[in-house]
Amino acid sequence: MTKLPMKFRILHLLSKKENLTIHEIMNNLRDEYGTEGQFKKTIISSYIQSLKAVGMLETTDVYFDDNNELTEKYNITEYGLGRLKYLPKEWID
C-alpha cells in the first residue's frame, strides 16, 4: 500500500477509530512512521491542530490524565470524511 502523508494518515485513522487521544494516535501510527523525524508529539499535535482549524477534526472530550496532563480526544468530522475521497484507491474502503 502507498504510504500516505502523515496528516492524511491521521485523518484516515480517525475515520476508522473514534475518540482517540494524541498518545493513542501515535501508538497506532508507530509501526508506519515511528522512524521518521516528524514522529514527535509536538509535530503530530500541530498536524492535529491544523486539521481542526480547517474543520476536518473536532475535539470530543477534554480532561486531565493520570499524569495531570491536559488531554483531548478527537473525531473526524463529516467534512473530514468527505476529504477521504482524495486518498489513493487502495486506502478507500
Predicted regions and their residues:
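Short capping segments at the starts of secondary-structure elements
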Residues: S15-E24
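Hydrophobic residues on short alpha-helical segments
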Residues: K7-L14
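Short, hydrophobic-biased segments on the C-terminal half of alpha helices
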Residues: S45-K52
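N-terminal positioning helix adjacent to the helix-turn-helix/winged-helix DNA-binding module
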Residues: T2-M6, K40
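Short, Lys/Arg-rich nucleic-acid/phosphate-binding segment
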Residues: D61-E72
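Short, positively charged loop/turn segments that connect secondary-structure elements
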Residues: D31-S45
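Short, amphipathic alpha-helical interaction segments positioned at domain boundaries
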Residues: E72-D93
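A short, conserved structural fragment
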Residues: K52-Y63
